[in-house]
């Protein structure tokens, strides 16, 4: 069993949905309205319920309006959502845009893409700092034993004796495999209610079943481990 996961969680980066958020360039050299005036982007109020943040625009690529996106997951490990989706959703501050993607491809550890109507480098530079979202329904299909992190967050975890172990609050990539962060209610040293955490490797030897419909994961793990 494997978690379809997100690249390295080192250097204190926090897991974000299915992915690991990477630092992005915040310098914005022009208003995105300049690009919108060219018919490339549509300002939107409505936002998809299943939108998942998958990257951020960090630079222009070339001279013909392509943008460069630092992805929160490598292509082949969740970042493929950017390559499959033909519609991206962009957000920066209070500004939200919808972009129709004409072409996209990997470039080193980034994804580069051309949005409809973004015709030159200046228009592409105007999009720097936008966070990029893709609808969950546009993610590539996975094998039966693979899961996106975003689909595991919030699932109940029980062991084979039906003892409740907690709820998946996040995922960690240790470079070898994924690890579930499972939160459960506890009592602190002061006698007050608190929340504690157990870490369970997301590998077949421990994870026996993942039932997304029932929102439950069954593991070979004891409460006192």
From Swiss-Prot:
A GO CC annotation given for this chain: ribosome
One MF annotation (Gene Ontology) recorded for this entry: ribosome binding
Gene3D superfamilies for the chain: PRC-barrel domain, RimM
Any one of the GO BP annotations: rRNA processing
The PRC barrel domain, residue ranges: 144-225
Xref: Pfam families: PRC_RimM, RimM
Keywords tagged on the record: Chaperone, Cytoplasm, Ribosome biogenesis, rRNA processing
SUPFAM superfamilies reported for this sequence: PRC-barrel domain, Translation proteins
InterPro entries according to UniProt: PRC_barrel-like_sf, PRC_RimM, RimM, RimM_N, RimM_N_sf, Transl_B-barrel_sf
UniProt keyword annotation of Lyase present: no
Location in the cell: Cytoplasm
Xref: HAMAP family: Ribosome_mat_RimM
Family indicated by similarity: Belongs to the RimM family.
Subunit structure: Binds ribosomal protein uS19.
UniProt note: domains: The PRC barrel domain binds ribosomal protein uS19.
Function: An accessory protein needed during the final step in the assembly of 30S ribosomal subunit, possibly for assembly of the head region. Essential for efficient processing of 16S rRNA. May be needed both before and after RbfA during the maturation of 16S rRNA. It has affinity for free ribosomal 30S subunits but not for 70S ribosomes.
UniProt-listed PANTHER family: RIBOSOME MATURATION FACTOR RIMM (PTHR33692:SF1)
Protein name in the entry: Ribosome maturation factor RimM
Originating species: Burkholderia ambifaria (strain MC40-6)
Organism lineage: Bacteria, Pseudomonadati, Pseudomonadota, Betaproteobacteria, Burkholderiales
């Amino acid at each position: 069993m494997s978690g379809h996961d997100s690249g390295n969680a080192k250097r204190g980066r926090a897991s974000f949905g299915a992915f690991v958020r990477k630092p992005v360039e915040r310098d914005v050299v022009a208003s995105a309205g300049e690009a919108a005036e060219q018919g490339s982007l549509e300002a939107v109020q409505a936002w998809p319920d299943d939108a998942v943040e998958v990257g951020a625009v960090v630079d222009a690529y070339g001279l013909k309006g392509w943008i460069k996106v630092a992805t929160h997951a490598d292509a082949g490990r969740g970042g493929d959502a950017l390559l499959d989706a033909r519609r991206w959703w962009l957000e920066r501050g209070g500004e939200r845009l919808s972009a129709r993607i004409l072409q996209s491809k990997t470039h080193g550890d980034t994804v580069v893409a051309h949005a409809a109507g973004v015709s030159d480098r200046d228009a592409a530079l105007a999009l720097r700092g936008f966070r990029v979202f893709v609808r969950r329904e546009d993610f590539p299909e996975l094998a039966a034993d693979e899961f996106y992190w975003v689909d595991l967050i919030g699932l109940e975890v029980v062991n084979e004796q039906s003892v409740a172990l907690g709820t998946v609050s996040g995922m960690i990539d240790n470079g070898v495999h994924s690890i579930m962060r499972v939160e459960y209610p506890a009592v602190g040293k002061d006698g007050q209610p608190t929340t504690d955490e157990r870490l369970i490797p997301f590998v077949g030897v421990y994870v026996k079943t993942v039932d997304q419909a029932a929102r439950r994961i069954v593991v070979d793990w004891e409460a006192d481990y």
